[in-house]
């Protein structure tokens, strides 16, 4: 019931009271009965080659049966194949039981062997230096969410969505008495047994669309190589320095790709055609857009890590303390940084241009944390003893971001690689980016606001296919933060009962730190701050420990 219902009252509430709907949707209960079985086998051994050298090695095997529905309610795209289970299905759409179709969402992957190897070596007799390293293969678990996309889809279940037009309708109550007849729509309810002779073209129209997701029948389990090498040296009593290289390389990562985009040669014409077309040049294709989960991406992470760790020790005058100082220089690269976010769609054409820094890439991170038992010795013992201070200090560079052209995902206006990737089109960068502080309101190009960068460096008229501004080519401001906890421990009954009081301060200096900016080149707040991290937060706590 909307305010703008055609022929309505211009009030959603009034339309509801008189029974004048704008749209009507009905769907049956369509439970998913997805089943899978997992088997994991592993073996590991440790070999003490010498007093100063230990080798650890092992092998793991994993197998998960492809997820299947107990009622066979899945389907696959296999171009050129005709279904015998549903003879009226378009060529290329197969179901369990068809030749060339998996019994579930995909064919089995029985190649998931995962070797592991590690070593620890003390090269010098004084045992103050250690060299360690390791390598391993790790397999992911395919998301069950991929299979839930079949839930409630045709031809296994029927649903109805009706948009009403008030023009020429005799009376509003006619909508409710016969919602299907009043609009000329067939009534699919009550649900009937599946008709395997149904003609898809005349009954359902082009198969696919926004509510239908497919799984590549040859989908494989994503896997990651992880490796590290580190050297640790005790440079003083209870003071240890560690330098490490840590990396990983992920392959066969799953992502969405529209496997039926419009033919680039026909884009911009009055009647563009899709690449899966029984009759080339025919604009009435049997398929709409077909988003499919596929092994379409990879990622890697490389880092150099330093740490200096002081174990608890008594320092003259200052008392007992410990701390860890750490610095990480790292780089994470991928094609897409997660499912269902802005760039989760992997383009059919030119996917390589989206390989760049990950959305969560942090190039430099410095942290310091520790504990200090305050050496108060003068005064009543229960009052001056038991005080401790715990600081956490963090400094890091900012996250990357992309400047988009502001084109929403659309099925009627596809992007360069079909439906779902229109929002991947970036703006054109026409000048070097000029970063601003964002701390005070200022006028930029005649617009006042809290700007983090000058928007005049970009144009919202992108150069085909995806604009000239690369993915994640720009950086948000870094972050400097300090949290501090003051703790008082007081024994009440010997060592059996004690009271702990603590005061915690997060962002103790109340430093304004921006976390996001408008990156839509078509927005009227483009380039302006949209959110910040929390200001100072104080927390008081009391605990009885027994």
Predicted stretch roles:
Residues 35, 52, 64-66, 186-546:
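Short, solvent-exposed micro-motifs at the edges of structured domains
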């Amino acid at each position: 019931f909307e305010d703008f219902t055609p022929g309505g009252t211009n009030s959603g509430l009034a339309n509801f009271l008189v029974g004048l709907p704008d749209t009507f949707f009905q769907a049956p209960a369509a439970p998913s009965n997805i089943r899978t079985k997992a088997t994991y086998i592993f073996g590991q051994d440790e070999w003490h080659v010498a007093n100063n050298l230990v080798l650890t090695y092992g092998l793991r095997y994993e197998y998960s049966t492809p997820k299947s529905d107990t009622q066979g309610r899945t389907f696959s795209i296999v171009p050129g194949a005709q279904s015998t289970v549903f003879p009226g299905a378009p060529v290329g759409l197969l179901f369990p039981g068809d030749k060339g179709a998996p019994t579930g969402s995909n064919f089995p992957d029985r190649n998931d062997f995962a070797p592991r190897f590690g070593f620890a070596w003390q090269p010098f007799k004084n045992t103050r230096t250690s060299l360690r390293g390791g390598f391993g293969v790790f397999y992911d678990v395919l998301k069950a969410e991929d299979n839930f996309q079949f839930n409630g889809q045709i031809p296994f279940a029927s649903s109805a969505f009706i948009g009403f037009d008030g023009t020429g309708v005799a009376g509003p109550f006619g909508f409710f008495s016969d919602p299907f007849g009043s609009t000329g729509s067939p009534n699919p309810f009550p649900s009937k047994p599946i008709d395997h002779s149904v003609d898809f073209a005349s009954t359902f129209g082009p198969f696919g669309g926004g509510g239908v997701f497919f799984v590549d029948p040859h989908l494989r389990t994503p896997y990651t190589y992880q490796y590290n090498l580190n050297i640790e040296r005790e440079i003083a009593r209870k003071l240890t320095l560690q330098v490490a290289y840590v990396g990983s390389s992920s392959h066969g990562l799953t992502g969405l790709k529209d496997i039926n985009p419009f033919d680039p040669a026909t884009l911009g014409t009055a009647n563009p055609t899709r690449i899966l077309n029984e009759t080339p040049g025919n604009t009435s294709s049997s398929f709409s857009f077909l988003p499919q989960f596929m092994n379409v991406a990879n990622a890697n992470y490389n880092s150099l890590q330093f740490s200096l760790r002081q174990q608890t020790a008594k320092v003259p005058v200052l008392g007992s303390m410990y701390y860890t100082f750490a610095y990480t220089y790292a780089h994470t690269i991928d094609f897409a940084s997660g499912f269902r976010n802005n760039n989760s769609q992997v383009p059919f054409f030119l996917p390589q241009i989206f390989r760049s820094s990950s959305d969560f890439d942090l190039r430099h991170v410095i942290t310091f944390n520790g504990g200090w038992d305050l050496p108060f010795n003068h005064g009543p013992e229960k009052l001056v003893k038991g005080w401790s201070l715990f600081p956490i200090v963090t400094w890091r560079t900012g996250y990357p971001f992309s400047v988009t052209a502001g084109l929403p995902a659309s099925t009627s206006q596809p992007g360069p690689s079909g439906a779902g990737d229109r929002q991947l089109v970036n703006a054109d960068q026409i000048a070097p980016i000029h970063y601003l502080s964002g701390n005070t309101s200022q006028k930029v190009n005649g617009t006042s606001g809290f700007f983090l960068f000058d928007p005049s460096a970009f144009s919202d008229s992108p150069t085909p296919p995806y604009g000239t501004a690369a993915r994640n080519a720009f950086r948000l401001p870094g972050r400097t933060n300090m949290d501090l906890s003051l703790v008082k421990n007081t024994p009440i009954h010997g060592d059996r009962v004690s009271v702990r009081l603590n005061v915690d301060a997060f962002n103790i200096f109340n430093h304004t730190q921006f976390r996001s900016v408008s990156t839509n080149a078509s927005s009227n707040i483009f380039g302006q701050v949209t959110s910040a991290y929390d200001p100072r937060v104080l927390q008081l706590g009391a605990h009885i420990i027994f």
